[in-house]
Amino acid sequence: MTVVPIRIVGDPVLHTATTPVTVAADGSLPADLAQLIATMYDTMDAANGVGLAANQIGCSLRLFVYDCAADRAMTARRRGVVINPVLETSEIPETMPDPDTDDEGCLSVPGESFPTGRAKWARVTGLDADGSPVSIEGTGLFARMLQHETGHLDGFLYLDRLIGRYARNAKRAVKSHGWGVPGLSWLPGEDPDPFGH
């Protein structure tokens, strides 16, 4: 099992769009990609996350892993990887997010969560670990995860989507933790679980 540090908000790799994974003419993926995917699963699992984008561990490639239920109250989970994802969503509400149902956290903003407006439905298409086409979709928490992880790969954190008092509270939290600068990370399994799982 290989668990690596997760970068914290302020690291340039989190704020830069990732590079698509190169697919050979025969459809094969780079040989070292399988090890990266295994490391991402190990790190996500150690952090008790529902998703992890490659740039969260310092790799600027366009892929994410996930292990997520459709709803916060459900125990049945879906697990997988999407390489070179393309996101499609229903309309994103223009109202203030609900603090009870729209709360969102991030392993790169450890221990904090803020209500974030997201589309109720999302679909991602891309490739699986074998290079075969894959399409996954969902509603609720699963749709939120798809939007969150794809956002990472586009160089955005969920903090960038916050509005009103939630945006102000997030800025204060980042400042109070001393984040927002390059070089900060935490190591799941070694550092305390910031979300108290």
Swiss-Prot record:
Gene3D superfamilies, sorted: Peptide deformylase (3.90.45.10)
A GO molecular function held by the record: peptide deformylase activity
Biological processes, Gene Ontology terms: co-translational protein modification; translation
Cofactor notes: Binds 1 Fe(2+) ion.
Cofactor: Fe(2+)
Domain of life from the UniProt record: Bacteria
Catalytic EC class: hydrolase
Active site (record annotation): 149
InterPro entries hit by this protein: Peptide_deformylase, Peptide_deformylase_sf
EC number(s) reported in the record: 3.5.1.88
UniProt-listed SUPFAM superfamilies: Peptide deformylase
Residues bound to Fe cation: 106, 148, 152
Reactions that this protein is recorded to catalyse: N-terminal N-formyl-L-methionyl-[peptide] + H2O = N-terminal L-methionyl-[peptide] + formate
Keyword annotations of the record: Hydrolase, Iron, Metal-binding, Protein biosynthesis
Coiled-coil intervals, chain numbering: none
Family from the record: Belongs to the polypeptide deformylase family.
Job of this protein: Removes the formyl group from the N-terminal Met of newly synthesized proteins. Requires at least a dipeptide for an efficient rate of reaction. N-terminal L-methionine is a prerequisite for activity but the enzyme has broad specificity at other positions.
UniProt-recorded name of the protein: Peptide deformylase
Organism of provenance: Mycobacterium bovis (strain ATCC BAA-935 / AF2122/97)
Classification lineage: Bacteria, Bacillati, Actinomycetota, Actinomycetes, Mycobacteriales
Gene, per the UniProt record: def
